[in-house]
Regions:
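Acidic/His-enriched low-complexity segments
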Residues: 1-249
Length: 249
């Protein structure tokens, strides 16, 4: 018999509210795992010894709380209720009302459930299987990619950065801001870091990104809006046809 859960306990307490997320994720498509770091700029709305956020199927490595870029001298512990997918972050001393940065390092698995940050694949133009990492956060699965206030009433700005192999391509909600093609060098590969512009304030379930063997067309302007078409490597001929049709609009 399945355990009966209290619906009210799925909701987060209202003592803290996020205003911006700075997210950095590094997926490894070969082993289907990812490492991540999120900095949540938040407002503590009442003096608190605990903050609760949503987490599901993530391993939490470190948690730091800063005020004005200075780490607080306040012992931190945490525990995760896997049934309710809520992590309670506990402080030795109460945190006064104010603005803070909550910085969390974590890791996870690229699942095959089409939920959160997951692994998928497709056949390329040569019939070879290609791997991708992509997202499906609606309605409450952003918590499987990064710790967050995963309720739609919380509207925040999102700054996304992705670390990936140089031969891969990625997109997110906003346009690229900066690309460092030599972000990290190892014995057998060089990784790049792609930073995206800030989004408008929005709910967590609207955040999206995809990483894989893709290419992008040149930007075209359609009725005042700049558009690109993202497509698998080797499928460019179809994009040329599509762009010719778009230009007829």
């Amino acid at each position: 018999m399945s355990k009966l859960l209290d619906k009210k306990k799925f909701r987060l307490p209202k003592n803290a509210s996020p205003s911006k997320y700075k997210i950095e994720l590094h997926p490894d498509l070969k082993v289907k795992t990812f490492d991540g770091k999120v900095e949540i700029l938040l407002n503590i709305l009442e003096e608190s010894k605990s903050i609760s956020i949503n987490v599901a199927e993530l391993e939490i490595k470190t948690i730091v709380l800063k005020e004005n870029s200075t780490e607080l001298n306040n012992s931190i512990s945490w525990n995760i209720d896997n049934d309710y997918e809520i992590m309670s972050i506990n402080f030795e001393n109460p945190i006064p009302i104010g603005e803070y940065s909550l910085i969390i390092e974590f890791s996870g698995v690229l699942n095959d459930k089409l939920r959160g940050f997951y692994h998928s694949s497709f056949k390329d133009h040569n019939g070879n299987i290609q791997s991708i990492a992509t997202t499906q956060f609606e309605s409450t699965d952003a918590r499987r990619a990064f710790p967050c206030f995963d309720e739609p009433e919380y509207k925040s700005v999102f700054s996304v950065s992705l670390v990936l192999e140089n031969e891969l391509f990625c997109v997110s909600n906003a346009a690229e801001k900066n690309i460092n093609n030599e972000y990290l060098k190892t014995k057998d590969k060089t990784l790049k870091k792609v930073e995206f512009h800030d989004t408008i304030p929005m709910s967590t379930y609207l955040v999206a990104f995809i990483i894989g063997p893709f290419e992008a067309s040149k930007e075209i302007n359609v009725n005042g809006t700049n558009l690109r078409i993202i497509y698998p490597v080797g499928k460019g001929i179809y994009v040329i046809l599509l762009l010719s049709l778009v230009n007829m609009l």
